[in-house]
Curated annotation (Swiss-Prot):
Superkingdom, natural source: Eukaryota
Chief location: secreted
Protein name: Ice-structuring glycoprotein 7R
Entry keyword set: Antifreeze protein, Glycoprotein, Secreted
Length: 19
């Protein structure tokens, strides 16, 4: 949900894994 809200986080799988 939070990843979908942030395009930058969605672009980076590493950041998505951290979040």
């Amino acid at each position: 949900a939070a990843t979908a809200a942030t395009p930058a986080t969605a672009a980076t799988p590493a950041t998505a894994a951290r979040a």
